[in-house]
C-alpha cells in the first residue's frame, strides 16, 4: 500500500518492517515513522500530530491496513 506522507513523498508500507511514533522536541510534534530496513535511521516520517493520542490513532489505522509490526 502506497501512502503520501505529509511532506508529499510516497512510501510503500508493504515494504516497511515496522511503525512507531516519537516526540520531536525541536518541532514539538509527535511523528509517526515507517521503518524500511535494519538500520536505526532507515525510516520515513509519515506525518506529525499535536498529541500522543492522535499519533497512536494514526499508527493503529495504518497498521490495520498493512502487515507491519507496531513498535
Where are these predicted regions, by residue range?
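Eukaryotic intrinsically disordered, low-complexity regulatory linkers and tails enriched in Ser/Thr/Pro
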Residues: 1-71
Amino acid at each position: 500500500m502506497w501512502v503520501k506522507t505529509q511532506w508529499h513523498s510516497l512510501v510503500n508500507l508493504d515494504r516497511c518492517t515496522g511503525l512507531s511514533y516519537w516526540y520531536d522536541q525541536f518541532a514539538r510534534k509527535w511523528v509517526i515513522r515507517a521503518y524500511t530496513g535494519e538500520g536505526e535511521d532507515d525510516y520515513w516520517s509519515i506525518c506529525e500530530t499535536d498529541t500522543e493520542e492522535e499519533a497512536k490513532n494514526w499508527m493503529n489505522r495504518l497498521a490495520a491496513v498493512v502487515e507491519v509490526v507496531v513498535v
